[in-house]
């Protein structure tokens, strides 16, 4: 049954992927190539020159590139050119000229042009700047409006280079903002903004390093904000490397597409596609300590190669999937918010590892296809199994999912140290499931929903075969696991609870032997709680009671901000909840504190020791 569902889902996903692969990359490449050919044909009238007499054209003025231009008034400002360093300086010029195809045209393919900006400069014409190897720098800014062609372009089939280290704003009404048959680099705190019909940046490979902001919007059908394609013979890989920069990308097709791989380190990337994918690569996707907000019609973020993300935040929203990786997926200490309408919010074809972090995954199951919130499927090449889908959750990961079905995999699901809450409508976990060696269940509750959930026997949790009475039948399931202590370790009431400590391990050790030993867990935690809580204080049964007890014991301090939780009506509890979240002793989801939320005793110990660490 599961295999049939997965087969249908895989077929639908493959169809969507084929649509994307057959349209977004090739179709855009075709449209871009056609555009470049169209532009090239129009430009031939001015670019077929004697190579020995290279020219620099600025508006309707033509200059020999071997001759200096002493400071000269032009367009309300001044220009100058140093023939030895090939440096053109614009100082406050405003040039509007439609007599040529390019406002600035540097036709020397073998010589780089250094463009230095001073003051505010404006160029308006059929096309903006054409130069095969161009570096833009200086303390000034440049605004380009191109009515027919690109804002900035190279010529030829390869070897082009563009480096931008100053503020540039481009409007390309009927072309790409930037089209370079080679490498593009944006650096030095530059701000680059563009609104264009076709691609925002179309190049072979891309580096954005320490840019203040790169804001690109493509308005044309079937176009990308960033399109990194590599060269035709494969000598230059189509890779994008983003470091410590802010990107805001909007387009019809994938807002951020790089053929052979994407690497993002630091900064923030916001990518939105109206009919395809927010961020996509056919290669590997590597993200470190960055904030990602990706949304698309098919899915928010995806790759054909493996995806690995360490640190940072990931928001991924799509019609079919939030995160869709056709390979292995590893998330290390990432704060994830993934949502989809139809299928799986977080999906991989191959091993998936969720190590630490906070993960929220919501599948609305609009497809009616018994969708999971998180699922690791097998990866095939025809009938050949390339990689088994397995799911591992560990590293004290906090996972909250909702959907028709909760979490699972085609292979083995393994749970290490984790806090997993599943609010599904059908089945919470797909078999087979195991607890990772060295870990045990600390708390287990389940039922048809959260309100009716009851304490369950941990011995009933692990199963390795289909069983209608297995614990996964509970649509709601909340499991908390932790490490096991050594045989000689015992709880220390003065030490309090720490999931990684001997005391925490000891609590875990007595919590795993069925109902009788579960009673041992109850005794152990009560002993610890009565030793650390104020004398005569009742053990809190929910989050609201715990927040009030912590706040009252701390002396009822005023929170820094006004209480703003929508689900807390009592004024004192509202202040307590606000103060506890501000101090980091308790967490909350958005504007909801969930004051009635069940709190296990070991969690009370953990929060108490955060609020009042032992001196």
Indicate where each model-derived feature is located.
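Feature responds to low-complexity, polar/acidic, surface-exposed segments characteristic
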Residues: 2-7, 21-40, 486-575, 582-605, ...
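Bacterial N-terminal signal peptides
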Residues: 13-22
């Amino acid at each position: 049954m599961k295999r049939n569902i997965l087969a249908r889902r895989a077929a639908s996903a493959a169809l969507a992927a084929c649509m994307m692969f057959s349209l977004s990359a090739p179709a855009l490449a075709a449209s871009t190539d056609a555009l470049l050919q169209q532009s090239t044909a129009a430009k031939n009238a001015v670019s077929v020159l004697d190579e020995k007499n290279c020219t620099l054209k600025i508006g309707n003025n033509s200059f020999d590139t071997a001759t200096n231009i002493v400071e000269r008034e032009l367009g309300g400002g001044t220009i100058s050119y140093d023939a030895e360093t090939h440096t053109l300086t614009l100082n406050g010029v405003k040039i509007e000229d439609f007599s040529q195809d390019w406002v600035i045209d540097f036709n020397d393919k073998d010589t780089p042009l250094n463009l230095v900006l001073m003051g505010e400069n404006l160029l308006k014409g059929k096309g903006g700047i054409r130069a095969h190897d161009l570096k833009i720098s200086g303390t000034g800014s440049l605004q380009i409006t191109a009515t027919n062609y690109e804002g900035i372009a190279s010529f030829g089939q390869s070897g082009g280079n563009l480096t931008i280290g100053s503020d540039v704003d481009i409007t390309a009404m009927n072309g790409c903002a930037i089209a370079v048959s080679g490498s593009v680099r944006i650096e030095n705190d530059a701000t680059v903004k563009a609104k264009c019909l076709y691609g925002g940046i179309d190049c072979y490979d891309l580096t954005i390093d320490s840019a203040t902001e790169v804001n690109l919007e493509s308005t044309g059908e079937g176009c990308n904000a960033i399109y990194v394609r590599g060269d035709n013979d494969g000598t230059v890989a189509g890779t994008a490397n983003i470091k410590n920069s802010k990107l805001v990308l909007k387009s019809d097709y994938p807002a951020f597409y790089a053929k052979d791989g994407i690497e993002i380190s630091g900064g923030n990337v916001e990518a939105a596609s109206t009919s395809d994918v927010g961020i996509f690569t056919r290669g590997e996707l590597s993200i470190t300590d960055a904030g990602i907000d990706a949304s698309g019609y098919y899915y928010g973020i995806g790759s054909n190669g493996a995806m690995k993300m360490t640190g940072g935040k990931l928001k991924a929203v799509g019609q079919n999937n939030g995160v869709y990786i056709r390979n292995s997926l590893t998330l290390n200490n990432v704060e994830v918010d993934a949502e989809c309408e139809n299928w799986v919010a977080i999906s991989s074809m191959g091993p998936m590892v969720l190590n630490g972090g906070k993960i929220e995954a919501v599948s609305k199951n609009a497809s009616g296809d018994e969708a999971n919130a998180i699922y690791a499927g097998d990866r095939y090449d025809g009938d050949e199994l390339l990689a088994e889908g397995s799911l591992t959750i560990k590293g004290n990961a906090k996972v909250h999912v909702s959907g028709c079905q909760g979490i699972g995999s085609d292979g083995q699901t393994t749970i290490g140290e984790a806090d997993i809450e599943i609010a599904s409508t059908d089945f919470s976990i797909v078999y087979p499931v195991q607890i990772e060696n060295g870990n045990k269940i600390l708390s287990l509750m389940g039922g048809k929903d959260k309100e009716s959930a009851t304490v369950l026997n941990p011995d009933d949790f692990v199963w390795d075969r289909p069983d209608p009475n297995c614990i996964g039948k509970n649509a709601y399931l909340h499991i908390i696991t932790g490490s096991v202590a050594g045989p000689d370790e015992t709880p220390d009431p003065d030490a309090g609870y720490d999931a990684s400590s001997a005391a925490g391990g000891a609590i875990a050790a007595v919590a795993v032997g069925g109902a009788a030993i579960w009673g041992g867990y109850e005794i152990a935690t009560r002993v610890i709680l009565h030793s650390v809580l104020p004398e005569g204080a009742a053990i809190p049964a929910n989050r609201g009671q715990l927040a009030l007890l912590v706040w009252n014991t701390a002396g009822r301090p005023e929170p820094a901000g006004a209480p703003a939780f929508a689900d807390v009506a009592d004024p004192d509890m509202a202040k307590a909840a606000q103060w506890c979240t501000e101090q980091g002793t308790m967490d909350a989801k958005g504007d909801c504190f969930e004051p009635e939320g069940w709190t296990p005793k070991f969690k009370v110990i953990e929060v108490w020791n955060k609020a009042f660490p032992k001196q």
